[in-house]
Amino acid sequence: MQINKFLLFFLSILILTSCSKNVVEDSVLKEKSLDLQVLEAYQEGKEYLENGDPLFAAKKFNEAEILFPQSEWAPKSALMAAYSYYSYDYLKDAIAELDRFLKIYPKYKNLDYVYYLLGISFYEQIVDEKKDLQSIIKAKQYFEKV
């Protein structure tokens, strides 16, 4: 009797598992490669910047940097994000992005451009040279590094 119950249990499990499908569906559309995603995000950022939307441009450039942080596109994307902010007078955002850039990529080959952009961002923040010297001093420091 014990053997019959075991056999009945085993057969029922066997029948139930044989009825289930384990089909892997192949999609016609494959996932995009990471390189392609980085390039697309970078291109979208350029398009947003050309169309006058610096915030979405910076967001796309940052997305490109995040997707592939060890690629050659990462520092370019971070720099373009900072330029996006600068080009539409979001100077504090540009400065923050450039400071972050200097911390992450201290040996980047075009650091002179980063220092120039930092200097010009501080220079353009000068409202009254008699009241606030902080922007003048910072601009001078960064221009001296160029």
Residues of each region from the PLM?
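Acidic, polar-rich low-complexity tracts and alpha-helical solenoid repeat scaffolds
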Residues: S18-V146
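Sec-dependent bacterial lipoprotein signal peptides
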Residues: M1-C19
